[in-house]
Amino acid sequence: MNMYQLLERTAQTYPDNLYLVREGVKYKDFIDLVKARAASLDKAGVKKGDVVGILSHNIPEFPISLFAIWYLGGTVLLLDTNLTPFEYDNMAQITECKLVCAEKAFVYKTDKFEFYDITKKDGKVNPDLKPAAVESLDIATMSFTSGSTGMPKVVPLTHFNIVECTNSLESMAEWIRPADILYGFLPMYHVFGFAVEILATLHFGAGVLLQPSINPKEIMADFKIFRPQVIPAVPRLWEVFRNKIIDNVKAQKKWWLVSFVLKYGKTLQKIGLGALVRKVQKPILDVFGGRARLLIAGGAATKPEVETFYERLGLTFIQGYGLTETVGPICISKPTKKRLPFAFGGPTLNNECEIRDKNEDGVGVLWLRGHQVFGGYLNNEEANKEIFDERGFFNTGDMVSMDKNGELHFAGRKKQVIVLDSGKNVYPDELEGMFITIPGVKNVAVFEHRVKDKTVTYGVFSVEDGMTIEQLGAEIANANKKVASYKWVTHFAMTTEDLPLTSTQKVKHHVVRQNLINGMYPDRHE
């Protein structure tokens, strides 16, 4: 089965379910829009085997063009909207992409490829244009994972990989139902947004409410009007939502009551005070529209206190793990009473894992094998030899451990692990998760750095206006007491500027480190 056939199956099963919620487009109508776009692209010269780029925010024409390209048997090059013309030109050359479906705001003069206006109105469906004969092992998408200049890594994913990922999402059937509304503000060019906004909706016959903006006012208005049942977001956004909710409650001088009810809600319900619990929860749940059932986090580890906050509101909170190389979610947690903080579950259907080279703490490198794992980077045999073993297992480069329940825990990227002069390993994610709870700290990057010919664990902190280097130092010293002394951060810099982030709100550690070297963070304690 290929991806267009999967769309056809969903449209036949749920023809009258809304797919594009804001636009009121049902699955049966979406099929016609795809066929009309396919006819337009066919006239533009797109044929089976061609690589066609999509450069767009989350607008309806994105999924319409996506499936239209697949209808014609093409490969979709998913392009990050935050790059430069030079990078797009290079990407097109590497992948032999000759046409890019783009919003007008991204169009520029180039001789590397042609632009196609993604918002252009399509004509009628061409009844003579049939779906291309696409095999399951044909390449469906390409994405860049390590930059677009120098020696980039391009991830080709087959229709088989993506269909299998879609099928594996059945593990979420307890929480996602046909006709649910899934909020879609994660960029669809990124594998997390692609997996939940395209694949999950397709599998369950659910609808997606696309939102091209990350403006909080627009998002809150959407929650109020459309009342989505499923909301995916990166952990950083879940933390921002939580903090704003708490600040609003404190401003009303009601935090003492809310915090008490959230902490003892189950006990209060058992003694007949369920009405009080619901009364306290309701205005908070109304922030998300009042119908939210499932919150999904991915792209990084979620702090336990953030996850606990939402679960005490009666919401189901799921943590997933995945990479571009695995079509996103290849591990999904299941919320149970036994589940430990930071757990992101185990491999999904038809996938398996091994943890190799464990240290004394049980932390080792995660290797994966299965139907969702890609076949190797495009035209990069050297890299492929390094990441695949003779048994077909893929080296993720991520450090994980397994708890007593058999669930995995993220410890950090192997390439970001700090190796001290003593030989001890320090995992930045562990320390960042600890430091981010310091009042006044907006974000933090921990990495390896040389100070006076010594390898140290260095931290760069983004803080609120008014915090002094002395105050921050005292908070860091207090936090350090929670971990072994060799992990302590005693060298750090402070800035009131935001740290550079990726499109999925992850800190760009390499950029922060280079900024430090370039003297951009003068407030230092070394």
Residue ranges and their predicted role:
Residues 126-144, 151, 175-181:
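Conserved pre-ATP/AMP-binding loop-to-beta segment of ANL
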Residues 16-45, 50-59, 67, 84-89, ...:
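Conserved AMP-binding/adenylate-forming core of the ANL superfamily
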Residues 26-28, 140-166:
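Conserved AMP-binding A3 loop
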Residues 231, 276-408, 414-417, 431, ...:
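Conserved AMP-binding/adenylate-forming
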Residues 163-181, 191-283:
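Conserved AMP-binding/adenylation subdomain of ANL enzymes
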Residues 100, 370, 375-376, 399-485:
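AMP-binding/adenylate-forming catalytic core of the ANL superfamily
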